[in-house]
Regions:
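Strongly charged
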Residues: 1-15, 40-101
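C-terminal accessory/binding modules appended to enzymatic or scaffolding proteins
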Residues: 2-31, 35
Length: 101
């Protein structure tokens, strides 16, 4: 998966790589459901780097394979999904929607 983001913030990269809204990722980070390099992510503003591993407690995982800069100064981030498929990510999103009610 290749995403283009204005920053390398954890919430932006996770959102782009997992196909979830940035606000959803922020809520998940606040609830302790997002891990960065196997440790609970403490801030949405954490900068993601090469070889970082972003994972959700449900098993979905992203590995940062490459970070380069575009000609316009944005970041081209190559991610690899592992440990889960998109259905688990969608299930997490659906269960979060129910929790918000």
């Amino acid at each position: 998966i290749t995403i283009i983001e204005a920053s390398r913030r954890l919430d932006a990269v996770a959102s782009g790589g997992l196909g979830l809204s940035r606000s959803r990722i922020v809520k998940m980070i606040d609830k302790g459901e997002v891990l960065l390099n196997f440790r609970e992510a403490s801030s949405t503003a954490t900068i993601v780097q090469f070889r970082d591993i972003i994972s959700l407690r449900n098993g979905a995982k992203l590995v940062v394979d490459e970070v380069t800069t575009t000609s316009k100064g944005k970041y081209r981030i190559n991610l690899r999904r592992s440990g889960s498929d998109q259905r688990k990510v969608q299930q997490q999103s659906s269960s979060d929607d129910e929790d918000d009610d």
